[in-house]
């Protein structure tokens, strides 16, 4: 049986409202899973560390800080996903990010 994963990643660009809308759009498209990324800047990068050119005027550290959701926000995204009958999946990029996913009982990471 095939499963469709809607890779949202960080395409919400730090907007919680956009993240909610992207989940709803994933449902309309028939997705079985929605997948986010969870970054915690302090555990992944240093302030003012060199960044790839696609980060434009923002360094990687600030980008991760601006686009990360807190525990409560992630919990709300998970609840909406499950309410719509999909599975919530997150890629953690540090052990600390994984700890947050475990607190939320995220099953897929």
Where are these regions (language model features)?
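Catalytic domains of carbohydrate-active enzymes, especially glycoside hydrolases
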Residues: 21-39, 104-105
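Active-site beta->alpha loop and helix N-cap motifs at the rims of alpha/beta catalytic domains
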Residues: 55-109
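Conserved, mostly hydrophobic/aromatic
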Residues: 7, 26, 101
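N-terminal small/glycine-rich loop or linker at the start of catalytic domains
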Residues: 1-13, 47-49, 57, 75
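Active-site beta-loop-alpha junctions enriched in small/polar residues
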Residues: 9-11, 37-41, 93-95
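Glycine-rich, proline-tolerant flexible connector loops at the mouths of alpha/beta enzymes
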Residues: 32-68
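Short, conserved beta-strand segments within well-ordered enzyme catalytic domains
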Residues: 5, 33-35, 87-91
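Glycine-rich anion/phosphate-binding loops
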Residues: 13-25, 71-72
């Amino acid at each position: 049986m095939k499963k469709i994963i809607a890779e949202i990643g960080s395409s919400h660009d730090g907007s919680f409202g956009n993240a909610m809308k992207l989940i709803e759009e994933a449902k309309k498209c028939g997705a079985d899973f929605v997948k986010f990324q969870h970054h915690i800047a302090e555990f992944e990068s240093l302030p003012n560390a060199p960044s790839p050119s696609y980060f434009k005027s923002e360094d990687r550290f600030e980008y991760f800080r601006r686009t990360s959701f807190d525990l409560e926000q992630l919990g709300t995204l998970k609840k909406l996903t499950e309410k719509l009958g999909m599975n919530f999946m997150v890629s953690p990029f540090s052990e600390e990010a994984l700890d947050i996913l475990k607190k939320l009982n995220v099953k897929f990471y």
